[in-house]
């Protein structure tokens, strides 16, 4: 177990009232949160989203990615379901950090795609550690999920970590002219299950 559960409080949102649960990485002190909606106890699989932190998309309304659109859509779907969990995985920029993400954006402005930009900066295409999310699920008492994702890597890692993903629920929102190439690159080079534009 890499995390410990630290604190919780009610979080009213436009989608209804969630319980915000805070976790801390034991080794680093870095924090992560889960937003819990409704009663997640029992044996029925829980609708869930693993959402990696994206300051630019989640808070600054960037159109370069689909993150903000996915965050809003996931919270809305969980609310409509009546129960569910969003894990807010604080690994900004696929875990290269905000400043390196800005550097990667600058390289993309020069014509590199999102994967090429990460590699040019000396990183892997995706540096995230999703095993932390399995720890969050376990600390919340969740063992079976219906996962809102387009990323097969998340499903694979959750299953390897003992979380049973019984269904993948697609979350395809927010495509626009500013992020179309980015989304196509995620589909082509990272295996994300997205509908591409007509060729």
Curated annotation (Swiss-Prot):
Substrates-to-products reaction catalysed: GTP + 4 H2O = 2,5-diamino-6-hydroxy-4-(5-phosphoribosylamino)-pyrimidine + formate + 2 phosphate + 3 H(+)
GO biological process: riboflavin biosynthetic process
Co-factor remark: Binds 1 zinc ion per subunit.
Enzyme's top EC category: hydrolase
Binding site for Zn(2+): 54, 65, 67
Residues that, per the record, bind GTP: 49-53, 70, 92-94, 114, 149, 154
UniProt GO molecular function: GTP binding; GTP cyclohydrolase II activity; zinc ion binding
Active site, per annotation: 126, 128
CC cofactor: Zn(2+)
GO cellular component: cytosol
Keywords attached to this entry: GTP-binding, Hydrolase, Metal-binding, Nucleotide-binding, Riboflavin biosynthesis, Zinc
Listed EC numbers: 3.5.4.25
Pathway annotation from the record: Cofactor biosynthesis; riboflavin biosynthesis; 5-amino-6-(D-ribitylamino)uracil from GTP: step 1/4
Assembly, per entry: Homodimer.
Its job: Catalyzes the conversion of GTP to 2,5-diamino-6-ribosylamino-4(3H)-pyrimidinone 5'-phosphate (DARP), formate and pyrophosphate.
Similarity comment: family membership: Belongs to the GTP cyclohydrolase II family.
Record protein name field: GTP cyclohydrolase-2
Species per Swiss-Prot/TrEMBL record: Proteus mirabilis (strain HI4320)
